[in-house]
Amino acid sequence: VDDPAGFPKNSPAGWQKQLAECGRAAAENENAYRILLCHRPERTEAYAESGFELVLCGHAHGGQVRVPYLINGLYAPNQGLFPKYAGGCYRLGNDVTMIVSRGLCRNELPRVFNPPELVIVDIKSKNPSKG
């Protein structure tokens, strides 16, 4: 699902349409493990209700500035000060996991105590005999 800021001003619900289309496509095979790749992490309610087990996103730049061992980022785009979803693994309801990457890039502000990261996710079957 694209960044909502990338849609024309007269189409503010563009990301919601994309999410609905992705959800419909994922629902076609109810036995599949459904993964959603989206830009922004703060749309958690919509993601939790969309039928995916795993949500992968970024955009928050890890909170741009971090205070080691104290906070998960000082500021993140579109979340403001002390962002809730700056980087890491989060549970959205009972069945949805969201992983937010701090990413490799930077915003206008330099990263402080916030090294770039590349997230690698290993997905393994609960039933090894089924692959």
Model-derived regions: residue spans:
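Conserved beta-sheet core of the metallophosphoesterase superfamily
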Residues: 41-119
